[in-house]
Amino acid sequence: MKRFVLPILITLFIISASAVFTLNFRPLYYHDISSLNIEETSGYSENVIRENYDALIDYNSVFHRGSLDLSLPMSREGRIHFQDVKRIFDVLQILCVLSLIGSLILGIRAWKQGYRGFLKSAAVLSVFLPVIAGILIAFNWGNAFILFHELMFSNDYWLFDERTDPVINILPDEFFLHCALLIILLILAASLIMGLIYLRQKKRRSGGPQLTF
């Protein structure tokens, strides 16, 4: 049972770190402003779009205290939804730090004891989420997007009305698709790296040909 704890911690770290990185990777959204023609579809200037997007990202930081201040109008339901989103991201950021600490403590101990199997287990375990998510996205991104919101939120406040919450016009579904794809790629990359490290260590211990990077 103890040998499952470390791979689970590593997997939790990889998933949460990938999500936190994507949340804070603002260049992705800045690129989408032009590639998705958000200025034209929303009717707002790039400065206004960036200002409100940056306010959302700053608000979702675990260190942020206070209310969300947008230059765009916002309904009561919209504000509640963003509060719900912040709680989720706060949990993710805390989970990221705690799982990293746990992974380092147990990982260093396992490494010193000569145990490398946790790398293989974590590599395999961390693949499941992106595979499932990838299948859902490939099958129907719209339904996957709706399913995610229905699972994560206990209300329907995420169904914005652009007349009362025009911020939805600067957050197209395609942007969230790009975020999902980036998270999947990061998780798969981490899984691949762990798998390669495991194979290299296995070859080294068996005296076989060395894997080089």
Show the residue positions of the predicted features:
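Juxtamembrane non-transmembrane "cap" segments at the membrane-aqueous interface
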Residues: 139-162
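Hydrophobic secretory-pathway targeting helix
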Residues: 1-29
